[in-house]
Amino acid sequence: MTVLRLLAAMLALILGMAATPAAAWGEFGHRTTASIALANVRPETRAAIQRLFPYAERLGTPECPLQSLEDAAVWPDCVRAQGSRWAYTAPWHYRTAPICEAFNPRANCASGNCVTAQIERAQRVLSDESLPGNVRLEALAFMVHFAGDVHMPLHSGDREDRGGNDREVTYGIVPDLNLHWAWDGPLAERAISSAQPALTRPYSAEERQALAGGGPDAWGRESWETARDFVYPEAFDRPPCEGELPKEATLTQEDIVRALPVAERRITQAGLRIAELLDAAFAPGKLAEPERR
């Protein structure tokens, strides 16, 4: 295959990816957060996770495998695409807030139908050993996936554009993406594949202290601030709240390079925090009650 044909094939692949529905971090990003988590949980947590996978058949989703934590990290996006059975879960993947208004941690979460509330709900279901294994396995998948979602800046920050879905961008030489998917897919994948050292590894206590901790509301605020202070200004080369933003933008190679450490940090934080959620869910005793919304 000539270099020109190879580049054309790669371009076709990326454009094909761009046509898929937005899902935070894309499959590769979500699987990476799960791999990071699995490398950093306690051994007894890892064993408890493995004991749930035999219940996957009872969920009745053969088209969406659920035999590993990496599968669990993408399972909610897979089932959401299967039709009406899982349509009610669509609002659980995000909680966007306008970046040009004061952040309100209680907004856009009616009846718990938002990503931050569903992380807490799923963790409590997962921790309840009196529940059937298939119910806990479903909760495991939702918790792991949504904890990844909340770390994606454009699942929390919004400029009247559905978290960047309505802003067309050219990503390097690749046209016709949207801002949301540029961050979900190619940017996240490049951040993961170029990271040195590799993101999937055991982290030291000092690294975990610097990168992990907090709870879903705080993680959502971090993502909102990242969207406000970096994603939108970097994409449009201007303060995002001074007048209307254009509907189109170009992410140059320089823009992409500046964004890589931001994406890398959010993916790493997601993985380490998923590990903390898992360790807490499988630890003896009851979880603390979440703050009431």
Which residues fall in each region the model found?
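Bacterial N-terminal signal peptides that target proteins for export
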Residues: 1-10
